[in-house]
């Protein structure tokens, strides 16, 4: 019989909150008897915005802002029903986007 995998992608602007949420998921999965592959750090997406400092003149004077989106990937191999229940009840920090594929 084919083994089931649960793939979890996490995204956040703050890498500390992301790593904390990742460790919570890994600990929950290991406690219920599933094997975990990861966390795998994916490339950080950097989005830059350039705006004029002055509203009227001085085109040469500009300011740059950036948003960094950090990502992690987890694979849970052979999850038990207890693993799925524990992951559904898990309360993660605000600001972490979670995508789950089965």
Swiss-Prot record:
**Per UniProt, what is one Pfam family of this protein?**
Ribosomal_S10
Q: From what superkingdom does this record's organism come? A: Bacteria
For this UniProt record, the keywords arranged alphabetically read as follows: Ribonucleoprotein, Ribosomal protein
Q: Which GO terms describe its molecular function?
A: structural constituent of ribosome; tRNA binding
Q: Which GO terms describe its biological process?
A: translation
**GO cellular component: a single term:** ribosome
Question: Is Transmembrane helix there in the keyword field?
Answer: no
Please verify whether the record's keywords include Phosphoprotein.
no
**Chain ranges passing through the membrane:** none
NCBIfam families, alphabetized: PRK00596.1, rpsJ_bact
Q: Which function does this protein serve?
A: Involved in the binding of tRNA to the ribosomes.
How does this protein assemble? Part of the 30S ribosomal subunit.
The record's similarity note reads:
Belongs to the universal ribosomal protein uS10 family.
Question: What is the official name of this protein in its record?
Answer: Small ribosomal subunit protein uS10
Gene name of the encoded protein: rpsJ
């Amino acid at each position: 019989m084919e083994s089931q995998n649960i793939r979890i992608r996490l995204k956040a602007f703050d890498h500390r909150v992301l790593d904390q949420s990742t460790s919570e998921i890994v600990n929950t999965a290991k406690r219920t008897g599933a094997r975990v592959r990861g966390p795998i750090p994916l490339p950080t997406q950097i989005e830059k915005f350039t705006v004029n400092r002055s509203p009227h003149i001085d085109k040469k004077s500009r300011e740059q802002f950036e948003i960094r989106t950090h990502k992690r990937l987890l694979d849970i191999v052979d999850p038990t029903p207890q693993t799925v229940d524990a992951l559904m009840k898990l309360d993660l920090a605000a600001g972490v986007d979670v995508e789950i594929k089965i």
